């Protein structure tokens, strides 16, 4: 009963770690966890896994649910990530953004966001006393108010990760979602806007412990 609900081709890592370059991002829906477990324990699946393993240099498998868990953000005490990235893409100087500017400015894109929230927000930006999940929600509300309509952005898929099944165990995420932008130009104009960098981004940085931002485009099959 699995269903491929999203498939994108990787174009660039805007916020990420060296060596984390991806060729494909697939969103696969299973009816239940039991269905997934039954599949991976099946002898035929185990037999064909050699083709998968022989083809991949690196991968992640992240279990997610659609509804927000009661214990959101995750209370798992796995320690802080070995290497963490809050989200400053240095829009006017970073090599990643220079490569971003070299690609077709008018092409529609998706941005995959992986977010791990802080236990408590940083003070000084109007989010004092909140947990990181509530702070990030305030950031999301501000983005919807200030940019969604003007930029033409939307969030077609949003999930709540439960666990990293394949990947470093210190990569623990609280949110995973895709944001659709009408063009690379629209995204860059937003993140370089002075109001975003001196307002909205401060809310994000105060709430986020670790993050990834991966530029993707719809895959043609």
Identify the residue ranges that each predicted region occupies.
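Short S/T/G/P-rich N-terminal loop/turn motif that feeds into the first structured element of a domain
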Residues: 1-25, 31-46, 55-178, 182-198, ...
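Flexible, disordered linker segments and immediate boundary regions flanking tandem C2H2 zinc-finger modules
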Residues: 49-53, 200-203
